[in-house]
Amino acid sequence: MREVLLSECIDLLYESHFVISKPFGRSCFDLIAKKADLRFLIKILKNIDSLSTEQSEELLNIAKMLQAVPIIIGTRTRNSIMEEGAVYERYGIKAVTFNTFRDQLSGEPPVVYANRGGFFVNIDGAVLRETREKLKISVGELAEISRVSRKTIYKYEQNEANPSAEVAIKIEEYLDVPLIKGINIVDYMEGLKSQKSREEAFEKILKEGEDFKIRVIDILGDMGFNLLETTKAPFDAVAEESKSEDAENQNIIFTNIQETENEEIRRKAMIVDEISKMLNSHSLLVLEKKTNENKQITSMSISELEKIGDTVDLLEFIEKKKKSTK
């Protein structure tokens, strides 16, 4: 079922003129999709409650650094089938069905979101108040019709609370005015958590005994890069020269860090290189010692990395390597 859903999403994204990455296994995301300045990090799950805390944290952190929209596409929750046209949320990440995602890409955003107690909608509180006062309808009258308290109506008008879908429809019908607003699931800034500190990330790496990885990340950090260490992605770290409001102008290096090189490492590095090209970024494989030169991958030994002065020097090194392989 998951494989079918993944295939359908790939077809949909191609039809919608997105450039997409190859699917990943055992990662916090399955696909990266890009069109113009819109980027998606997509996780496909049959049961959206199977997303782990660790996966969600990493997905959010990568999305924030790449200025991308993290989204889960699934079919059910732990207890029930997911409703079409409704937005769910897990660990701050929006989750929808395939059909709801397709409608969003077609310009038809969902209007209902799932929360404890049922399904709710966002309404325009200012329009609600203006219309009620214009029609000379008291708060008490509207509360009685809606079967909620007067206090709740005041909260709706101040945008301090949202009604259930059922209550919103009653209010709309009584006032004869549209109040329900669509939910923008492509707002990448909404709900994104802050990244973990380097100290927290190092603690995890230390527990896993990855001394070589720590050495490389320390060197990159000393150069002046902002760093995000990963354990649930096809790359080991994302190094960012500086934060830019424009995703296209970010100098980002997707970094794989391995003591020894083998066929599996090369395959993963080539996939990461494809991601970097898709996102107008860079990729780098750092090894204990370089073996055979692979012209398709930008790689260097840790001793070479230690000789690099700063972020500018490393980016120039990568650019020079790219040009030499063309």
From Swiss-Prot:
GO terms for molecular function: DNA binding; DNA-binding transcription factor activity. Residues 128-183 form the HTH cro/C1-type domain. The keyword Transcription regulation applies. Residues 139-158 bind DNA. Pfam families: HTH_3. Disulfide bonds: none annotated. SUPFAM superfamilies: lambda repressor-like DNA-binding domains. SMART domains: HTH_XRE. PROSITE patterns: HTH_CROC1. Keywords: DNA-binding, Transcription, Transcription regulation. The keyword Oxidoreductase does not apply. HAMAP family: HTH_type_cro_C1 (MF_00584). This is Putative HTH-type transcriptional regulatory protein MmarC7_1702. The lineage of its organism: Archaea, Methanobacteriati, Methanobacteriota, Methanomada group, Methanococci.
